[in-house]
Amino acid sequence: MGQKINPLGFRLGTTQSHHSLWFAQPKKYCEGLEEDKKIRDCIKNYVQKNIRISSGMEGIARIEIQKRIDLIQVIIYMGFPKLLIEDKPRRVEELQMNVQKELNCVNRKLNIAITRISTPYGHPNILAEFIAGQLKNRVSFRKAMKKAIELTEQANTKGIQVQIAGRIDGKEIARVEWIREGRVPLQTIEAKIDYCSYTVRTIYGVLGIKIWIFVDEE
């Protein structure tokens, strides 16, 4: 059987950079890791609670965390930042308070910045959310995949592969369906590939969505 490695971890240090930048003593490392998870979960939960009502899309491509001794800098890359910025100071302050409460950071300052992405549908996380929304609304999976590929083509990517696994359309037997458009060279380390796996809960059960996007060659 083919051994499938995560395309992001495979390219770390060449075309892929780390999403968390900090140093820690070996004994304290797990605490830092746990802190990162808390920050990411807290932000996602806040965005989910406040935004689901209006559009059903979170639009978070990635969350980068940089830590210094007295400062935690969090950068949220969003495809549709107006969701958080409509009444900007209040929303961001509220989010900051939530994260601070969760972390209980006494002697460290927390700073949250929001960066807009020019082509939201060129990012697999946002695309996976779009497909998940379609599947929840009982749109046929093939239609959802094709629509996602059309959206990606507008974002000037060189190739995309979408895979959906599980009880598709409520069938008794789980199966894997996939579709590819353009080139997706997973073996080439120089090829910048963006990847995400996303779980969606539908009325039929849990489906797994995986998306590979070939951005461009270094």
Curated annotation (Swiss-Prot):
Subcellular location: Plastid, Chloroplast
Organism superkingdom: Eukaryota
InterPro entries: KH_dom-like_a/b, KH_dom_type_2, KH_sf_prok-type, Ribosomal_S3_C_sf, Ribosomal_uS3_bac-typ, Ribosomal_uS3_C, Ribosomal_uS3_CS
Molecular function in Gene Ontology: rRNA binding; structural constituent of ribosome
Matches recorded under SUPFAM superfamilies: Prokaryotic type KH domain (KH-domain type II), Ribosomal protein S3 C-terminal domain
Gene3D superfamilies linked: 3.30.300.20, Ribosomal protein S3, C-terminal domain
Keywords: Chloroplast, Plastid, Ribonucleoprotein, Ribosomal protein, RNA-binding, rRNA-binding
Pfam families noted in UniProt: Ribosomal_S3_C (PF00189)
Chief location bin: plastid
Keyword Nucleotide-binding tagged: no
GO cellular component: chloroplast; cytosolic small ribosomal subunit
Signal peptide as annotated in the record: none
KH type-2 domain boundaries: 47-118
Assembly: Part of the 30S ribosomal subunit.
Similarity remark: Belongs to the universal ribosomal protein uS3 family.
Protein name: Small ribosomal subunit protein uS3c
Species of the source: Aethionema cordifolium (Lebanon stonecress)
Lineage: Eukaryota, Viridiplantae, Streptophyta, Embryophyta, Tracheophyta
Gene: rps3
